[in-house]
Amino acid sequence: MKKLSFQQIILTLQNYWQDYGCAILQPYDAHVGAGTFHPATVLRCLGTKPWSVAYVQPSRRPGDSRYGMHPNRMQHYYQFQVILKPSPDNIQDLYLKSLECLGLDLKTHDIRFVEDDWESPTLGAAGLGWEVWCNGMEVSQFTYMQQIGGIECRPVAGEITYGLERLALYIQGVDEVKELDWNGQVGEKALKYGKVDFEAERQFSKYNLELADSEMLVRHFKDSEEQCEWLVKKNVPFAAYDECLKASHAFNQLNALGVISVTERASYVLRVRHLAKICCTKWLEMNE
């Protein structure tokens, strides 16, 4: 079997989960730290209505800035997110079959489910979960979503988050993300991951760690916080949640700069969690 390019990995996962019955959504157009922060997960996992979706989500974690010098850690990367609500009994088997569709031989690769109950303090979200390791490196997270915004998820949703770059390293048999085959072409049309993303990775690392204006970020956080609370009162929780995400990203940028103390960090986490909770509460109130 020919090794899949990075874009073919995404297309294969989209086709696999589409055939299962998932709606294939598009990435959310905001700065988020993980696919979980997409409103298709945060808001739609709440309530009793069935919801099965899959989508790619570009994700940003300023604290993981490495100037493009680390083999598999970046401040900007891609996740593939699957939400199955209610969670089917065979969700683990579905996941393993998806790996086989990607060309991973489960007999030659050491695939392990390592217990790791998941929690997002800023979202007020938690669930029973497992990291999925391939040959000792985490490539996916598998969670039974039990709580979001401090609200119980009934029914429980199953969440699968694929780390696309790390999976691609094993699928293509290369050691560094920048060497990944992006488009499966040869000659002048060939593109590697490094040519697509790594100049931006270098520049954003410099911004995240050296150039970002901490005073401006504090103002941005406060503005988004106030706007979120006001929009919830106006009964537009989707718009309010956008402001929650802006506040969350401003906090992550401040944290990456190293300008907030441990006590201040805890306070910021609680403030973002409050925003997530009021957005979730209002959305549920309007949709159940």
UniProtKB/Swiss-Prot annotation:
Its EC number is 6.1.1.14. Keywords: Aminoacyl-tRNA synthetase, ATP-binding, Cytoplasm, Ligase, Nucleotide-binding, Protein biosynthesis. This is Glycine--tRNA ligase alpha subunit. HAMAP family: Gly_tRNA_synth_alpha. Transmembrane segments: none annotated. Tetramer of two alpha and two beta subunits. Belongs to the class-II aminoacyl-tRNA synthetase family. It is an enzyme of class 6 (ligase). It comes from Rickettsia canadensis (strain McKiel). NCBIfam families: glyQ (TIGR00388), PRK09348.1 (NF006827). GO terms for cellular component: cytosol. InterPro entries: aa-tRNA-synth_II/BPL/LPL, Gly-tRNA-synth_heterodimer, Gly-tRNA_ligase_asu. PROSITE patterns: AA_TRNA_LIGASE_II_GLYAB. It is found in: Cytoplasm. GO terms for molecular function: ATP binding; glycine-tRNA ligase activity. It comes from the Bacteria. Pfam families: tRNA-synt_2e (PF02091). GO terms for biological process: glycyl-tRNA aminoacylation. PANTHER family: GLYCINE--TRNA LIGASE, CHLOROPLASTIC_MITOCHONDRIAL 2 (PTHR30075:SF2), GLYCYL-TRNA SYNTHETASE (PTHR30075). It catalyses: tRNA(Gly) + glycine + ATP = glycyl-tRNA(Gly) + AMP + diphosphate.
